[in-house]
Structures are given as C-alpha cells and as structure tokens.
Amino acid sequence: KKVIEKHGYPVISKEQAQWIERARRGDPQVIREKLYGIRPDGSRSRFCTSAEWRRLFNAPFKISAECCSEMKKKPLKKYAHETGRVPIIGTMASESKLREKNWLKTGCNAFEAKRPVSMPMSFWLEKDVWEYLRKYQVPYCRIYDMGYERTGCVFCMFGAHLDAEPTRFQRLQRTHPKLWRYCMKDWE
C-alpha cells in the first residue's frame, strides 16, 4: 500500500506505466513519441500508446511501474550485495515478451551482467512445471486449486485488462474477501 501511495498504481503493462509516468514528468521524447506517435526525426512511430490508454496520461491518480523495483528488484539487489550470492529467479521466457527477449539475449545464466542472475526455468513452459510437480509428487500451494494460474503482487493490475472472467480481482473477492476489501475498499 505504501509503495502504491508513493509511486502509483501498476496499470496496463510495465512499459505503458513507465511511458505514462515519464510523460507526466514532462519527458518531451516520451510525450512526442508515445503520446503523439512522432519520432525525433519526424517519422511516425508504431510504438505509440493506443488511444484506449491515452486517457491515463491525465488520470486523477499516480501510475507507475516502480512497485516491481521496490518489491522485487531492490530486495534482490540488496541480497546479492550483502551475501555475494547471485539470485536464482523462477521466471519463464514464455511469461512475457520482455522475459523472452532477455532470455534470448542472455540465456539462463547472466553471470557477466551488471547484476548477475540465474534463471534456470527460463526455457520451461507452464505445462513443464505441472508435469514435473506431478511426476515427482512435489507439494504446491493450494491457491492454484482455487482457479489461480499465477501468484504475485495482489495489487498488480498489469495485464488485468486481458483477464477472462472471473478476473483476478473477482477471484480475490471470492477466495480472500478480507484481502480484497483491503485492496479495494479500505482506501476510501
């Protein structure tokens, strides 16, 4: 809650949230290219924010992707600094275009990167995970039996516009009403 109050809500996608935040700070390149679709050379950019999301540039609340840095990246960086160990992260390239791009660039182990990291599950698919759990009878969190496909930050709205019904927030209301109320109602 403190991170959202300080930085803003994570909406649409990390990339869209970053563009919106930078445009609100007055970044002329982002305003020109992402809001109006004009590159610095005057040509049209195909990476313009869609008209559907342009209204968020003037939304009455803060928008940011900083929650990911605050809740995930900074703690991992601190851990690596304090212990000298490389974090092992369980993300898969199939989860997003950005993760796929990074995996194609570095593979599973990016030990030579500015912030070294190991991602041994990068090439796995979700079906591989479930096959492994069944084959080796590995216990897993029961939340996956409640209709959840992913876990993560409960406030996260990244990709929520793509959710089928019941959406993540509708499921949260049904399975964890107190947490849903904290997320949705206790701010009023």
Regions picked out by a protein language model, each given a short descriptive name:
Residues 1-128, 135:
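ATP-dependent adenylation/nucleotidyltransferase module used to activate substrates
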